[in-house]
């Protein structure tokens, strides 16, 4: 797979599921300015709070194909592997799909992201070991020096002035 950084600004993102994995995925995409709809009969309290704050739309029911027909990015994160598989297999080949129960059913892995200022590092084990991905990301984070981040941020500002 080719690692890319994709803008989700104003793109329609649909998340199926409301548990802890859905919440982790939601936290990753919410900061990117996406138009997020989460579909699940039950959700973690933090997801409910985000919906109450109107940061996301929450449909309190099971997912239906119509929910993700026009989505740019679909995250199949229910606690039912068969439902996740159905979502992944019925998506258009032009949609980005992350399937949490079987990464190979989707066409997108969600890496662990280490972000400090304008320095962004994506870390992935291609779905093989989330535990090792997390461990590696923590090690990478320790390598990113504050002076380095400041220099990159300064250069970013200089380039914008050109």
Curated annotation (Swiss-Prot):
Protein keywords: Cobalamin biosynthesis, NAD, Oxidoreductase, Porphyrin biosynthesis
Pfam families the UniProt entry points to: NAD_binding_7
Protein task: Catalyzes the dehydrogenation of precorrin-2 to form sirohydrochlorin which is used as a precursor in both siroheme biosynthesis and in the anaerobic branch of adenosylcobalamin biosynthesis.
Positions with a binding annotation for NAD(+): 20-21, 41-42
Catalytic reaction annotation: precorrin-2 + NAD(+) = sirohydrochlorin + NADH + 2 H(+)
GO biological process, one term: cobalamin biosynthetic process
Family (UniProt): Belongs to the precorrin-2 dehydrogenase / sirohydrochlorin ferrochelatase family.
The keyword Transferase belongs to this UniProt entry's keyword annotation: no
Protein name per UniProt: Precorrin-2 dehydrogenase
Effects seen without this gene: Cells lacking this gene are unable to grow on minimal medium with nitrate as nitrogen source. Growth is restored only after addition of both cysteine and ammonia to the medium.
Provenance organism: Bacillus subtilis (strain 168)
GO molecular function annotation: ferrochelatase activity; precorrin-2 dehydrogenase activity
InterPro entries noted in UniProt: Met8-like, NAD(P)-bd_dom_sf, Sirohaem_synthase_N
Induction per the UniProt record: Up-regulated by sulfur starvation and repressed by cysteine. Also induced by O-acetyl-L-serine (OAS), a direct precursor of cysteine, maybe via inactivation of a putative transcriptional repressor of the cysH operon whose activity is controlled by the intracellular levels of OAS.
Protein EC: 1.3.1.76
Pathway assigned in UniProt: Cofactor biosynthesis; adenosylcobalamin biosynthesis; sirohydrochlorin from precorrin-2: step 1/1; Porphyrin-containing compound metabolism; siroheme biosynthesis; sirohydrochlorin from precorrin-2: step 1/1
């Amino acid at each position: 797979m080719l690692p890319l950084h994709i803008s989700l600004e104003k793109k329609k993102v649909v998340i199926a599921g409301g548990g802890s994995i859905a919440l982790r995925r939601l936290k990753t995409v919410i900061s990117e300015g996406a138009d997020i709809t989460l579909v699940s009969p039950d959700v973690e309290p933090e997801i409910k709070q985000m919906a109450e704050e109107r940061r996301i739309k929450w449909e309190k029911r099971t997912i239906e194909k119509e929910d993700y027909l026009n989505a740019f990015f679909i995250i199949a994160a229910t606690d039912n592997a068969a439902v996740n598989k159905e979502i992944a297999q019925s998506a258009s080949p032009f949609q980005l799909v992350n399937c949490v129960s079987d990464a190979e059913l989707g066409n997108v892995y969600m890496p662990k992201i280490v972000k400090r200022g304008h320095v962004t590092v994506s870390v992935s084990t291609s779905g093989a070991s989330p535990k090792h991905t997390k461990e590696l990301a923590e090690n990478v984070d320790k390598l990113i020096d504050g002076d380095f981040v400041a220099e990159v941020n300064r250069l970013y500002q200089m380039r914008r002035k050109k």
